Each structure stands twice: as C-alpha cells, then as structure tokens.
Amino acid sequence: MKKNRLFSAALSVLLFIGIGAPKAQAQDYYQAPPLNPEFEVLANQVVTLNLDDPEGANKAFAKLLKKIVGKKNDLFAVGDYFLKNNAYSAASQCAKKITDEMAGEDVNVYMFKGEVYMKGKQWGRAGEEYEKALYYDSTYVPAIRRNAFVYKNINPDAALDYLDKLQRIEPENFRVNKDKGDIYYKLKRRDAAIENYQAYYKSAPKDSTVLDFNSCQQYVLSLFEAQEAAKVGELSTEMLQLWPNAMVFKRMRFLADVDTYDLDAAAEHVSYIVNQEYPDSSYKYLDYFYAAKLNELNNELEPAIEYYKKALAVDSTQALAYKDLSNIYSQNQQAELGLETYKKYLEVIGDKADLSDRFFLGRRYVAVYQEPGVDPEKKQQCFDEANKIFAEVMEKKPDFIEVYIQCARLNNTDSSVANDTVKNYYLKVIEMTAETPDEYKRQRLEASKYLFFYAINVEPNDMQLARRVLDIAAGINPNDKFVQQATK
C-alpha cells in the first residue's frame, strides 16, 4: 500500500507539471479531432482533482487512459486538451501512446507530438516529429515554421534552410525576413542581417503592434556597426514615431547626429541624457562618450571632461575614452592629468600598444614639460623621458618625420641661441623629405625657418645653409612673413 501511494504521488507530480500556469494559447500548427464528451469530462476531472485530491486525479487519469489507449484520434484529442491546459506530462503520455504506425500519414498527429516536445523543451525530439510531417507533405507550412523555430538556436544554418524554403512558398511573408535577420544577427553576419531586416522593414506595416521591436532594434544596431550613420538617424527617427519612449532609438538618433556632424540636431537630441529622462542604470558607455564628443566638437572642454569621466565610470575598459580624455586635458591646460590619463590608456590596451602609442606618450611628457608652473625636478624628468621615448621611436622607425620635428622642438630650450642638436634634427627633416617635398610642406617650412636662424647666428655664419633653406621656404610660400623679411 505504501509503495502504491508513493507511486501515485510521483505520478501526480509527473502528470501535473505546469498546472496552475496560465493556459497556453491555441496554435494553428495542427488541427485536433473532436474530443469525445465522455473523455472531456474525465480529462477535466483529472485537471480539477489534482489540486485537492492528487490520488483521485491519478485514478481518473488511469481510467481515462484505459479507455483511449490504442485509439489514435481519442489519444490525440485528449492529449490536445491536456496540452492546452498546461498538463504537460499528461499530454506527453498521450502523445507517446500514439505510435508512428498509428499516426500513418496524418501530419496533424506529428505536429501535435512536436508541440508536446516543444512544451517540454525537447527541441531535438520536436524537430524529429516535424520532419515526419514534412516527409508526408514537404510543403506543409506549419512544420516548416516550427522547424525553423526549433533549429534557430541549435542549428541556425538548418533554420535558415527552412526559412528559405518557407520564403519560396510564401514570398509575401515579411516575417520570414525578420526571422532570417534575427538569425544572421545572432551569428554576427552583419551584412546578411541588414539585408533581411531591410526587406522586412520595407514590407511590414509601420505599426508597433505588427513590427517586432527587438528586430527593429537589431536592424538599427547593425547599421550603426556598419557605420551607416545617416540611415541610423533616419530609421531611429521613424521608429520613435512608433515607440516614442524607446531609449534605444533616442540613443541611436543622437549617436547618428554626432557621427554625421549635425551638431544642431545633436544639441537637441542629447536632451535624453542632459535631462536624465531615464534611470541612471539605463545609460550606457556610448551615451556619455558621445555626449563628451558633442561637447568636444563644440569646444566646450569642461563638460566634455565630465562626460568622458561618466563614460569611464560605466565601462573602465574602454581605451578610446582614456585616449580622448587625455587629449582634452592637454587642450585644457591640464597636461599632468593628460599624461596620467594617457598612461591609463596604455595600461588598458596592454600588448596592443604600438609605436605610435609610444610616440604620443612622448608628446604627453612634452606637454607637461612645457606647462607653466610645473615643479623643476618634474619638468626635467619629463624632458628626459620624452627624449628617451622619441629616441626609441627613431630607432624603430627611422623614416617617421614627425618624431624629428618633436625632438627639435623639445630640445630648442632657448630660442635665442643656435643649438646644434636642434639643427641636426631639422636637417634630417629636410633630407628625409627631399624626394616628396609637396607632402611635407609644413615640416619643411618649419625646419627651414629654424635652420636659417641657426645659419645667421652660428659663428661663423653659414650663409650657404642660409641661402639653401631660404630658397626652400620661398618655394613653399613666397608670401610667408619670414621669407619676405629674410629676402630684404
């Protein structure tokens, strides 16, 4: 007796997993046969008794099962009743009693069994049942749809094949493009995702009850990743007509404004950040990063600094924000903060740092060295460190013109005295740019001016050098004030 009660209790648990949950929505994937009124009474009794009398429910189920076993249509109809009332295990037992021999060529039975397995999240077994339906009717749309759904997470290529098949049968079904776009998006196949989302958005009614919000969001995000800023702005504006409070579309519209340098529109659309329209936790790194960019483009350095700091507070792994913040600090006469922030940038990128990163670190040291009020000892340290870094860059990339310019400027510590070290750096610039003078006019003009100064101030004067570099400067810009004064 005790054993039987334990079995009954276990059976009760199996039979009624899911009872008490909201009723499943009826689907159009299959058509069940009519339910015999006698069996409907028993099935309803099984469902209602379970809450107060599990043992009675089990007896009712056993009685019902005994009456319908071996009868395909009755097993199907009763199983459908249990499935629609979320009695998954009871529905499953009915489905299992219907053998393939009993089902024969009845695609509705295979679809029902597939839905039972779907309810139990047995995706592979569900797919097998849908395949059986397709074996008997290769164009059976419900089976194609469900297989596409089943496979989209476990075998996306198979899902795409089913969707292609469905598209050939239903070429006007815009949801097929939506589903294909979703799969390609998940696979990170951006161009294919955009192509399908574009077809979906073009064909679907512009109605928020029809269009899928997540797919529209992924469409815009894919375009943003593809750097289609103008299209991002256009679509985000349209989608805000459908979902006026959707933060993602306000964000993407604002980002597009900044990327297209539409600063007036950006100043208007940044309001969702400025006015704190959403909870703090809703704002992402890109919100603050682009707000910083907008202020930077408007030469509003202090607000830009604050937004960069907010961006990094959200995501401290974003190297670009450290680099850009370092630049802003330097522009804002905060060179020491610029140097420390640039070091943080190098720390974040780690082994990805290249020679250009080292070069710009040298420039940050130069900025601190040149900033008024810096402690003399620190000033000297920055001078030495900058020269050391520039020497390293020269050694590894001897054809990098700009590093010679920077070294010349750094070592020109007294502009009233002719300096051999500075002269040699500028001579190197003239020499290295001789074959491509038009590409380096600015650098050659700067070098020529210093070399002329050096030539007429060194003892004895080097008039040959003076004439040579004056000719170079005159060839670059005969109206330059230096050229006009030197030729008098």
Q: What do these predicted regions represent?
A:
Residues 1-32, 208:
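Bacterial Sec-dependent N-terminal signal peptides
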Residues 11, 15-17, 107, 139, ...:
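Residue-level marker of intrinsically disordered, low-complexity segments enriched
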Residues 27-459, 488:
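Alpha-solenoid helical repeat scaffolds
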Residues 458, 462-467, 479-482:
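Alpha-solenoid helical-repeat scaffold
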Residues 473-474, 479-488:
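Eukaryotic acidic, Ser/Thr-rich intrinsically disordered low-complexity regions
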